[in-house]
């Protein structure tokens, strides 16, 4: 009976994943994430919590995964689309090589200023070129220039979901073969598994955009992908050709 019960339990866990409770999520944060989070990132996370749009910030669990990936890949030229207060940007700047550079674009300079003092305090401001711009305009300008095609080692996207597919078509040309693009919020609060009729109205527009992106990434022969249930979902894409 015990064996059968355990078998049923682990079959269900294998199918659905373990993170079915807030307690387990908090355990991971308390045991493995927060003890490893740098003091500068911790301060920025706390500062972001007082922002009225704090829910837009990168989760510390996703930030840890991002840092781990960057320290492994060691990209020297990266681009970040969507910055908000800069948690993921600071995590990137702390993780790439000393001579690494980040082009960061966001329309909201005020939100970026929340984290700027901590970016300076961490001593990594020189790695960052922050551009106040509509991201589509910047990406189109980079492609039109010609010098930037296939020049980036890594891209991170956490911006307006309505343009995720458009960003993908541009970033796939801007990252080099073997380079990586990471998209945040690709599970959209878990609603991607729901039929559209069950998605709350306030989430529906972005639900359409995120599910469309997921379908495209799942069938795009130009990339290998890993879609992970970390934070609000993060998808890593490696350009194959």
Swiss-Prot record:
GO biological process, one term: lignin biosynthetic process
Binding positions for a divalent metal cation per the UniProt entry: 158, 184-185
Broad EC category: transferase
Keywords for the protein's UniProt record, in alphabetical order: Lignin biosynthesis, Metal-binding, Methyltransferase, S-adenosyl-L-methionine, Transferase
EC number(s) recorded for this UniProt protein: 2.1.1.104
Pfam families registered for this protein in UniProt: Methyltransf_3
Cofactor section: a divalent metal cation
CDD domains hit by this protein: AdoMet_MTases
GO terms for MF: caffeoyl-CoA O-methyltransferase activity; metal ion binding
Matching PANTHER family: CAFFEOYL-COA O-METHYLTRANSFERASE-LIKE, O-METHYLTRANSFERASE-RELATED
Stated family: Belongs to the class I-like SAM-binding methyltransferase superfamily. Cation-dependent O-methyltransferase family. CCoAMT subfamily.
Protein name: Caffeoyl-CoA O-methyltransferase
């Amino acid at each position: 009976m015990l064996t059968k019960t355990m078998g049923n339990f682990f079959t269900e866990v294998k199918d659905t994943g373990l993170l079915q409770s807030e307690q387990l999520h908090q355990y991971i944060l308390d045991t493995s994430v927060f003890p490893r989070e740098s003091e500068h990132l911790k301060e920025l996370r706390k500062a972001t919590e007082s922002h009225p749009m704090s829910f837009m910030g990168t989760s510390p669990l996703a930030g840890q995964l991002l840092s781990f990936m960057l320290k492994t890949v060691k990209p020297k030229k990266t681009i970040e689309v969507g910055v908000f207060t800069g948690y993921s940007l600071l995590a990137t700047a702390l993780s790439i090589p000393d001579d690494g550079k980040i082009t960061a674009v966001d329309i909201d300079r005020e939100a970026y200023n929340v984290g700027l003092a901590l970016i300076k305090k961490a001593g990594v401001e020189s790695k960052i070129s922050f551009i106040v711009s509509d991201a589509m305009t910047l990406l189109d300008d980079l492609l039109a220039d010609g010098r930037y095609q296939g020049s980036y080692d890594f891209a991170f996207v956490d911006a307006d979901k309505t343009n995720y597919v458009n960003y993908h078509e541009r970033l796939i040309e801007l990252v080099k073969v073997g380079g990586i693009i990471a998209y945040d919020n690709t599970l959209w609060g878990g609603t991607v598994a729901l039929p559209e009729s069950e998605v709350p109205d306030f989430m529906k527009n972005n639900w359409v955009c995120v599910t469309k992106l997921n379908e495209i990434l799942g069938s795009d022969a130009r990339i290998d992908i890993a879609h992970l249930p970390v934070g609000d979902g993060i998808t890593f894409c490696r350009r194959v050709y």
